[in-house]
């Protein structure tokens, strides 16, 4: 199962080099690395989709810090490097900070993540035949680098420079519907983002501010080809007496976009007891899309009422999105027992796009078998969407004596939405576009009661809207939450939380209704600095219904989702002399629309031979079972590891 991760060798070499050069000085250093291996039983693809640990070498933890006295002749007085997960892990990072007080501050963050999905039941027409995974899968890797430099930090004016690079690439599988059938395709995907930013931060005594301007560039490429063995498609039934097959398929699409971004921040103390905050952010994105597609086979189309043996298609599209948001908040102290917070929030988003698609059908014949001329089709579509929202809010906080704090909040939002779809996009007539207005009012209140050993909290929120625009909008929503914390002794604390959320849209054709209840209890025992135990129990129950449209015949039917989950979580950590033992166990059982059981157990032992050298042992298991997909939806994975620990 081992997969190559080239960042491990590079990262480990860099860590040892940095440590070797700094250990002779006043430096804190620790490195925990070793080898881990897996024993996989069951569906390995499903395990990788959810957990994705691997065989191989891995850096569990690395830390290096070097702090120097002011005035030292070296290039820094602060150097901190942290890393974890590099190697046989689905997520790894390296973070570094270096600087000199009031001269510069440099931060570097690097992350690497593996993204894998191969679910057995997703887009799988052959699951009843025991064939899995489904036909929508991907196996991709992302790398992200972010560098930020501040010059003269903490002074009146601080210049800021930054750069960000992100890349996501790798293969995948998808399906494409054409010729009255659906075919499996292989995909090679590459997505890259580069971003430059520059700005100034201001420290003006009682006021601080920052202005940051960024420029983002996006490039994406997707290459699709017919998967080997997929010539017959997913549907074996003939169409009007003819078998539908595809002998070749290729599509290359590219997307590129640019986006200038602006961010402004202001915070200040106007006078004693009066503070203001303000932010403004804007991003204007322009993107262009191009596509070239070619396919051949024995295919049928009811759109042109013909059989055909080939199709060539080119597409070009462009879109422009303008997005901005501004916020203003004022906090005022009304005496010693009352605070008033006033807020205003306004946001706007406009999306305008055009698309041109030209299709040429070749090798055309009528459904009766007579030869016919080639068919050319042109689609020219223009769409527009615009959304404007303003919100006013006010919160009053009152302290009634020392233990009791109560608060109340009011907010009102107005939304103006414009949707202009192209006629070619409309499948079901009616309510596809137009100008809409929606108002949303919120009332909320809460209280907190604190004693020496007891803390109680309760809050309530209610949202009411006059209409809905999107099917996911709601007319009414209510939430009630409560919490309690009780410290029986210094070393023993018991806490509990509970919440109930309900949302409803009683409009024919939508008929959505959601009820969610959640409860958790936590017990924390810490009799000494060398021992800690925590036990947690949680329940989760949700019922959700909404009317949906069946794409095959456009009929309306109710959709119901049910979930009832129960979670146990236990964690123990103890340290005796040079031994450090960690034990963890959790179990989550869910019944309802998607029933499954997941159990995770971990035992970790760290033993230091001396003040500088030690070893670590790890044993871990993941046990997952699905109720509907018995066997093909199950896996049991055991992970073992041996690690070397170096520190000073």
Where do the language-model regions lie?
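Gram-negative and organellar
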Residues: 26-29, 35-648
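Bacterial N-terminal signal peptides that target proteins for export
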Residues: 1-10
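Sec/Tat signal peptide C-region and signal peptidase I cleavage site
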Residues: 20-24
């Amino acid at each position: 199962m081992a997969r190559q991760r080239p960042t491990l060798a590079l990262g480990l070499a860099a860590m040892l080099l940095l440590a070797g050069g700094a250990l002779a000085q006043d430096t804190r250093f620790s490195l925990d690395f070793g080898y881990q291996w897996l024993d996989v039983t069951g569906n390995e693809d499903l395990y990788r989709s959810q957990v994705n640990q691997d065989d191989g070498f891995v850096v569990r933890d690395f830390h290096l810090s070097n702090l120097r006295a002011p005035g030292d002749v070296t290039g820094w007085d602060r150097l901190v490097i942290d890393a974890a997960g590099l190697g046989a892990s689905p997520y790894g990072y390296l973070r570094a900070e270096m600087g000199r007080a009031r001269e510069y501050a440099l931060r570097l963050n690097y992350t690497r993540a593996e993204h894998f999905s191969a679910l057995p039941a997703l887009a799988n027409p052959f699951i009843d035949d025991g064939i899995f995974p489904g036909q929508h899968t991907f196996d991709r890797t992302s790398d992200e680098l972010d560098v930020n430099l501040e010059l003269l930090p903490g002074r009146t004016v601080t210049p800021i420079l930054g750069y960000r690079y992100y890349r996501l690439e790798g293969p995948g599988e998808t399906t494409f519907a054409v010729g009255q059938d659906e075919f499996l395709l292989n995909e090679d995907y590459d997505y890259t983002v580069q971003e430059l930013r520059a700005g100034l931060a201001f420290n003006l005594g009682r006021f601080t501010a920052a202005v940051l301007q960024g420029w983002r560039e996006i490039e994406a490429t997707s290459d699709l080809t017919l998967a080997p063995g997929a010539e017959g498609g997913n549907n074996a039934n003939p169409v009007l007496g003819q078998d539908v097959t595809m002998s070749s398929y290729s599509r290359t699409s590219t997307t590129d976009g640019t986006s200038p971004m602006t961010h402004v921040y202001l915070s200040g103390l106007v006078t004693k007891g009066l503070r203001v905050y303000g932010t403004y952010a804007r991003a204007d994105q322009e993107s262009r899309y191009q596509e070239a597609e070619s396919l051949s086979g024995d295919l049928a189309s009811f759109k042109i009422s013909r059989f055909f043996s080939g199709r060539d298609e080119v597409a070009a599209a462009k879109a422009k999105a303008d997005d901005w948001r501004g916020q203003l908040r004022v906090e005022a102290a009304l005496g010693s027992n009352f605070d008033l917070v006033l807020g205003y929030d306004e946001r706007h988003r406009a999306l305008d796009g055009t698309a041109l698609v030209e299709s040429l059908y070749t090798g055309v014949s009528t459904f009766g078998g007579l030869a016919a001329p080639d068919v050319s089709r042109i689609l020219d579509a223009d769409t527009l969407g615009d959304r404007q929202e303003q919100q006013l809010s006010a919160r009053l906080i009152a302290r009634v004596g020392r233990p009791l704090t109560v608060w109340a909040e009011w907010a009102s939002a107005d939304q103006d939405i414009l949707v202009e779809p192209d006629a070619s996009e409309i499948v079901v007539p009616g309510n596809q576009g137009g100008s809409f207005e929606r108002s949303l009012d919120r009332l909320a209140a809460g209280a907190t009661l604190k004693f020496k050993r007891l803390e109680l909290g309760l809050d309530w929120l209610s949202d009411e809207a006059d209409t809905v625009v999107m099917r996911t909008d709601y007319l009414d929503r209510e939430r009630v939450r409560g919490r309690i914390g009780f410290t029986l002794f210094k070393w023993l604390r018991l806490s509990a939380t509970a919440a109930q959320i309900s949302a409803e849209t009683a409009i024919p054709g939508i008929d959505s209704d959601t009820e969610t209840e959640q409860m958790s209890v936590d017990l924390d025992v810490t009799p000494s600095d060398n021992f800690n135990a925590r036990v947690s129990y949680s329940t989760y129950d949700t019922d959700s219904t909404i009317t949906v449209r069946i794409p095959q015949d456009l009929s309306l039917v109710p959709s119901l989702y049910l979930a009832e989950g129960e979670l146990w979580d236990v964690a123990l950590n103890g340290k005796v002399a040079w031994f450090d033992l960690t034990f963890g166990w959790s179990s989550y059982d869910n019944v309802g629309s998607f029933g499954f059981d997941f159990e995770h157990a971990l035992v970790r032992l760290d033993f230091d031979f001396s003040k500088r050298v030690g070893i670590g042992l790890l044993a871990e298991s993941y046990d997952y079972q699905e109720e509907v997909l018995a066997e093909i939806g199950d896996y049991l994975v055991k992970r073992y590891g041996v690690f070397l620990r170096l520190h000073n």
